[in-house]
A protein has these predicted regions:
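Hot-dog-fold acyl-thioester-processing enzymes
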Residues: 2-77, 132-153
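A short, structured loop/turn motif at beta-sheet edges
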Residues: 16-18, 115-119
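Generic short beta-strand
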Residues: 31, 111-112, 128
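Conserved GNAT-family N-acetyltransferase fold
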Residues: 49, 111, 124
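Hydrophobic beta-strand-centered segment that forms part of the acyl-chain substrate-binding groove
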Residues: 56-108, 121-123, 128
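A generic structural motif
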Residues: 84, 114-116, 131
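A structural signal for beta-strand boundary/capping segments at domain termini and interdomain linkers
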Residues: 120-121, 138
Length: 153
């Protein structure tokens, strides 16, 4: 990451308080999440981000299993992630997320992870598409889900 990009992210994080984010999930780092040195393996941050998005939807009353039964699902279309600091075994992390933009058949989640000292250790931007699972083609979000997400946003 370029120094300019990192400075922009730090400035953005300073201007975005936790209250700007609609959901926060605390996650403990387990041994299974780390490499032999006790540092979180970078791809596991993707799992942490996914858990926060899934738990937020569950809290909003959106049951993803029920959605799958209708032949529709949410898939990650695009990810942009920056690892800024390491996370270590047994640390308690906070995963924050908000919807940056809602579209007819996709949404963009803005997420970041902080450590126990409140320092941002990882940031992510995720484009989630709503697709017809049989055709693997984009479809409009079901109306009830779209309404819940608009209210939450």
């Amino acid at each position: 990451m370029t120094k300019t990009r990192q400075q922009q992210q730090e400035k953005q994080q300073e201007s975005s308080s936790v209250s700007d984010y609609q959901y926060q999930l605390n996650i403990r780092v387990y041994y299974e999440d780390t490499d032999v040195a006790g540092i979180v393996y970078n791809a596991n941050f993707l799992r942490f981000f996914e858990r926060a998005r899934s738990e937020w939807l569950r809290e909003l009353g959106i049951n993803q299993a029920d959605i799958l039964d209708t032949g529709v699902g949410f898939v990650v279309r695009r990810v942009e992630m920056d690892n800024l600091l390491p996370a270590k075994f047994n640390e308690l992390l906070s995963v924050h997320c908000k919807i940056r933009q809602m579209r007819r058949a996709s949404m963009i989640f803005d997420q970041y992870i902080t450590n126990g000292d409140g320092k941002t250790i990882c940031t992510g931007l995720f484009t989630i598409a709503c697709v017809d699972l049989a055709k693997m083609k984009p479809v409009q979000f079901p109306a009830n889900i779209s309404e819940v997400l608009k209210v939450a946003n």
